[in-house]
Design a protein with these regions (language model features):
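Transmembrane helical core of 7TM receptor-like proteins
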Residues: 1-303
Length: 303
């Protein structure tokens, strides 16, 4: 088999044109938001802390994750030939799996970092030292790419009956539906992978935020408590969207949604979440906005 045919999201021309503009705009926002975060953290020494180290890694993962899927989508929307070469499909599936799993694990590590900062502020720099931060980030990436390697190998070793994929990208469940043999083993592997890469970090997120809430309740200042709850709430919204859509797609009952519904959910966590992460995690952060103002003032002064 030399190529796969991707049916995409819709065959209506008017809808495809509007989606072409929408996806390009969202991808542009994703690129600008994440690159801006990387530049600000690099330029401002006040942001050289464990929290912003993890944000740097998350932004890099988001850039790569979005770039592995989104650029192909506008091209296919306006093209009559919606095909992708076999090895390009393999690389896309492998990369998206690895980066998605790495992102889930990173969100768990970031929640743990936040809980240490709130619960142990005096010992924060001692606990979250450079070696631990590097180890956590590297562990997230290694685990994500190892998981991707396993899933990719067992998926593409299956004999496929045809090459027409009812999806907008090469995605595990969509490719598995092309198999001519029983895929029960693959479904078990996907479920185990989902538990390890999604549910374990999600449990860590819930545990960490539980500790954060408990610590906040001991704050006597109503203003300080409200501010802390607002910050945690913003982070929790992004985490809930990211984990919620993935859990619905990979761990939910197969009868609960149609293939088209699955595509919409996959679109959400592949396109929307990487765009929202820099907005909610960073651009609403006062320290990041202060760094942005400082950089703009420097350019204004030079001008």
């Amino acid at each position: 088999m030399r190529e796969f045919i991707l049916l995409g999201l819709s065959s209506d021309w008017g809808t495809q044109v509007s989606r072409f503009v929408l996806f390009l705009a969202m991808y542009f926002v994703t690129l600008v938001g994440n690159v801006l975060i990387l530049l600000l953290i690099r330029l401002d020494s006040r942001l050289h802390t464990p929290m912003y180290f993890f944000l740097t890694v998350l932004s890099l993962v988001d850039l790569c994750y979005s770039s592995s899927i989104v650029p192909q989508m506008p091209v296919h929307l306006l093209s009559a030939q919606k095909s992708i070469p076999f090895y390009s499909c393999l690389i896309q599936l492998s990369a998206s799996l690895a980066l998605a799993a790495s992102e889930f694990l990173l969100l768990g590590a970031m929640a743990y970092d936040c809980s240490v900062a709130v619960c142990y502020p005096l010992h924060y720099t001692v606990i979250m030292h450079g070696g631990l931060c590097l180890g956590l980030a590297a562990g997230c990436l290694v685990a994500g790419f190892t998981n991707s390697l396993v899933e990719t190998v067992i998926t593409f070793r299956l004999p496929l009956c045809h090459n027409v994929t009812n999806h907008f990208a090469c995605e595990t469940l969509a490719v598995l539906r092309l198999a001519c043999v029983d895929i029960s083993f693959n479904k078990v592997v996907v479920a185990i992978s989902g538990f390890l890469m999604i549910m374990l970090p999600f449990t860590l997120v819930l545990f960490s935020y539980g500790r954060i809430v408990a610590a906040i309740l001991h704050i006597h200042s109503a203003q300080g408590r409200s501010k802390a709850f607002g910050t945690c709430g913003s982070h929790l919204v992004t985490v809930s969207m990211c984990f919620g859509t993935a859990i619905f797609t990979y761990l939910g009952p197969q009868s609960a949604y149609s293939v088209d519904g699955e595509k919409v959910v996959a679109l959400f966590y592949a396109v929307v979440t990487p765009m929202l992460n820099p907005l909610i995690y960073s651009l609403r952060n006062k320290e990041v906005m202060a760094a942005l103002s400082k950089v703009l003032e420097k350019f204004r002064y030079k001008g």
